[in-house]
Amino acid sequence: VLDSYVARTQRLLQNPAAPTSLYSEADLTLYINIARGQLAGEAECIKVLGTIDTVVDQQAYDFADIDTGVAATNGVQGVINVSQAWYTVGTGRKWIAPKPWPWFSLYTFNNPVPQGNYPTTWSQYGQGAAPGDTGSVNGGNFYINTPDQVYSLVLDCSCYPIALVDDTTVEAIPYLWTDAVPWYAAAYALWSAQNNARMADAERYFNTYTMFVERARKASNPSINRWMYSQSGDPAQAAKMQVQPRGGAGG
């Protein structure tokens, strides 16, 4: 898939062949991988049920320790955020209630002598993704109420992909979102030129990227209960913000 990304990005940039190439293939590969990471975070399109085992009396767990499968097989590098959590019981699972960090800090964390129990609440604290090829040493983590024994947790994770190094690298980003990647990569290349005309072109390309991301989300959600997915946005948002139709048009 990398070769296809590079070719499509070159066409968008009308990149001439060597020796007058404006953007090297190495640079385009870098921009493509940046685009893929940003897309994965924005669209939350790489979903994995990750797993992690608790440690007795340990509340904090790093995203980096969540098992999301074999990266070389599924193309997943790591976790960006967690939206739901369960713990396994017998052959089934029980839901763990998510809480905002201020609530968790006051009602669960705020205890000099915490008592062990089965998982009842959890909260994300750390932000962002690491490690992998991010260059960051920090990353997200989450807390649960003090576990009294080892529990196997199942986590609903939004993930980011491994970097593409050649055409055999597995792509974790699903279609239709893959159509957006070359547009972001081309925009990034034009931004790097630091030229007014190219910067203007970059904004147009970025707007096209945004359109493809939105279309992919709409296409991926079923017609029934379309708005039940958090990534879809709120159809009543305009009314809540008291935004009026242009030109006095009716609602």
Sequence positions of predicted segments:
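Glycine-enriched, solvent-exposed interface loops adjoining structured elements
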Residues: 1-251
